[in-house]
Amino acid sequence: MFMINILMLIIPILLAVAFLTLVERKVLGYMQLRKGPNVVGPYGLLQPIADAIKLFIKEPLRPATSSASMFILAPIMALGLALTMWIPLPMPYPLINMNLGVLFMLAMSSLAVYSILWSGWASNSKYALIGALRAVAQTISYEVTLAIILLSVLLMSGSFTLSTLITTQEQMWLILPAWPLAMMWFISTLAETNRAPFDLTEGESELVSGFNVEYAAGPFALFFMAEYANIIMMNIFTAILFLGTSHNPHMPELYTINFTIKSLLLTMSFLWIRASYPRFRYDQLMHLLWKNFLPLTLALCMWHVSLPILTSGIPPQT
């Protein structure tokens, strides 16, 4: 029975990932005053299926000097971790309702760094290695602010369980009292998922394609799916943290519809940002984090710690 539950979670995610690639190409197309994919099927709807077939029937070549086991293991690990992070997400009911769901998600996103590092190192190519080192530095750096922002939000929620956030936000969305945190969180999620304007790992003019430059066919598709699964997951996480949907146990469908609309709008904003902004320079990317975001988030975290103590407010006990 549990296996069926897992499949019921994984299959829709993979379908969503497939069609997000199409949506991205269509949105970017319309923003550049062109049509996007419109040949394969009506409105290009069969394009993701064609892409999947093409990628998975190609021969998975690898460099002669690469480390075979690690080279193959890295993309599998990337997708595995990307799918694992969906387990504690309340939509409205999670697959496993963990007491420390937020901590679990932080741990899994930190582990994802290894798949990037291994792929760059095992490729035995200077471009892949530089891309991997950039990606790792960027991911680790932005995880610092993500963790501090999460801590501040959880101080308002009073529990590490994600389902508690739904109860916390019945009266008011947390984006209203904590809008500076929400803005920094959104920008940090962009950097964490390696999206424009923070896609330094894929700087075409410098690194060809970043850490996955030596990958082709199936393994490349796994990296691609992991990236897009992470994008959707991060937007869902943002919707849960800051745009909490009121959950009526008698009509759980309303929660799901509400929640899906918010997540889709956030995903659309990712695509909009990609179409609008040029890429950052690497030093600007690090400057933004260590000299702007980190002091601000630390100050706000101290504020959220001291406020309940000053006003004798006791957070909800669970």
Swiss-Prot record:
Entry's EC annotation: 7.1.1.2
Superkingdom of this protein's organism: Eukaryota
Keyword Metal-binding: no
Official protein name in the record: NADH-ubiquinone oxidoreductase chain 1
Family the UniProt entry places it in: Belongs to the complex I subunit 1 family.
Matching PROSITE patterns: COMPLEX1_ND1_1, COMPLEX1_ND1_2
Origin organism lineage: Eukaryota, Metazoa, Chordata, Craniata, Vertebrata
Keywords: Electron transport, Formylation, Membrane, Mitochondrion, Mitochondrion inner membrane, NAD, Respiratory chain, Translocase, Transmembrane, Transmembrane helix, Transport, Ubiquinone
GO cellular component: mitochondrial inner membrane; respiratory chain complex I
Membrane topology annotation: Multi-pass membrane protein
Modified residues (N-formylmethionine): 1
Subcellular location: Mitochondrion inner membrane
Transmembrane annotation, as ranges: 2-22, 70-90, 100-120, 146-166, 172-192, 222-242, 253-273, 294-314
Cell cycle in keyword set: no
BP-aspect Gene Ontology terms: aerobic respiration; mitochondrial respiratory chain complex I assembly
Function in brief: Core subunit of the mitochondrial membrane respiratory chain NADH dehydrogenase (Complex I) which catalyzes electron transfer from NADH through the respiratory chain, using ubiquinone as an electron acceptor. Essential for the catalytic activity of complex I. Essential for the assembly of complex I.
Chief localisation class: mitochondrion
